[in-house]
Amino acid sequence: MATVIWFVLAHLCQTMMMENRLKFIEYGNPIGKTVVYFHGAPGSPDECSIFDKHGKEYGLNIICYDRLSAELTLQGKGYYQNLADAIKDKVNDGKVDLIGFSIGCHVALETSLYLGDQVGNLHLVAPAAPLVEGNFLDGMAGGVVFSLAMNYPAVFTLLSYCQSLLAKLTPNLLFKILFASAAGKDKELTRNRDFENYITPILKSCFNKSLKGYIRDINQYVAPWKVRINECKVNTYIWHGASDNWSPVGMAKYLADMIPGCKNTEVMEGFSHYSCLFESAPKICQQLAEESQVIPYDAAMPNY
């Protein structure tokens, strides 16, 4: 009888662990070298789909965890440790490269510290730097949102729920509001129906399914984290649009100066936020493939 009870309890514990395990979406080459992508906020794992073609071309298995769905009890260090544990479950003792976009760069950097020397390279695309450093808020398109999160968190939460309502009822209006101040080549993207079809489901997913996770990410971003930057000694590469008004280019320069492991910063003239992501994606994949000497997707598939 005791054996049966032990077996049932063990099965229940295993089931609970499986249910709490972070889900992820993968793109590119399923048997390629693992690269973990950290989407922006707002954002969702589907944001990573732009890497699918490039991942296949360069033999990379690019995955994105649904981190906004993580247990809401996970805050601060526990949140980043949980992400690191999920990545370790995937790669075991192997090496992994990380790519962060926008606020996802903050999460990627924090998580890298819990992965230690398992991280080969860290690529930060349009990274958002700590707001307590520099005069960044005035030059940010979303400066009001971040200012509310820092100074009036209850009002920020209320605003987020209003955005959630828009995402449910009129997602196209939410798209227009968020991109009303688009600059540089992001302006061209906003007139592209394919881009709207790409980004609208991402916004709906974030503000509907993962709203509380989004609020957590923003709250953790606006809190002080400068000291963590000084601990990032992994090989780091920064990609930034010169016309970015979501993450002003000064943020890239600040991070390049503060990250001990920063190897290179590429500032792309005319590019802004999402346009920088689209432009840098194939370049990042090519660089990772050349460093790892991985096999392209077609060449890796067996012939029958």
What kind of feature is each model-predicted range?
Residues 22-72:
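Conserved HGGG/HGGXW glycine-rich cap/lid loop of the alpha/beta-hydrolase fold
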Residues 80-97:
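Conserved acidic catalytic loop of the alpha/beta-hydrolase fold
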Residues 97-138:
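Conserved hydrolase catalytic core segment
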Residues 122-161:
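Flexible "cap/lid" loop of the alpha/beta hydrolase fold
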Residues 143, 149, 156-227:
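Alpha/beta-hydrolase
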Residues 232, 238-240, 244:
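Short beta-strand/loop motif that positions the catalytic acidic residue
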Residues 245-251:
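Conserved alpha/beta-hydrolase "acid-adjacent" motif
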Residues 262-304:
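Catalytic active-site module of serine/aspartate enzymes centered on a nucleophile-bearing elbow/loop
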